[in-house]
């Protein structure tokens, strides 16, 4: 079985994007942003809120908090 290698950051952002989970993003200057991730790449995150999009550079992000519990990994009980 070939296993894809994906870093934790991409896995997290892709999960919240697919599940449309609302996030709170804190920037390094203390600004608090909320919204849903619509897209991301190696350098930035596109955040949507109230019909408006914001492009946030990853180097400016301090912390990302999902607005609800989320599961990123499959449970290990079914694995043999």
UniProtKB/Swiss-Prot annotation:
Residues 10-70 form the Sm domain. GO terms for cellular component: cytosol. One of its GO terms (biological process) is regulation of RNA stability. One of its GO terms (molecular function) is RNA binding. InterPro entries: Hfq (IPR005001), LSM_dom_sf (IPR010920), Sm (IPR047575). It comes from the Bacteria. Keywords: RNA-binding, Stress response. PROSITE patterns: SM. RNA chaperone that binds small regulatory RNA (sRNAs) and mRNAs to facilitate mRNA translational regulation in response to envelope stress, environmental stress and changes in metabolite concentrations. Also binds with high specificity to tRNAs. Homohexamer. Belongs to the Hfq family. HAMAP family: Hfq. This is RNA-binding protein Hfq. It comes from Agrobacterium fabrum (strain C58 / ATCC 33970). The lineage of its organism: Bacteria, Pseudomonadati, Pseudomonadota, Alphaproteobacteria, Hyphomicrobiales. The gene is hfq.
């Amino acid at each position: 079985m070939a296993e894809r290698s994906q870093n934790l950051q991409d896995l997290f952002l892709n999960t919240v994007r697919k599940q449309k989970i609302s996030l709170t993003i804190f920037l390094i200057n203390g600004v608090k942003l909320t919204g849903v991730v619509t897209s991301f790449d190696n350098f930035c995150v596109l955040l949507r809120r109230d019909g408006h999009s914001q492009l946030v550079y990853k180097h400016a992000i301090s912390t990302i908090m999902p607005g609800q519990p989320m599961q990123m990994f499959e449970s290990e009980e079914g694995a043999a």
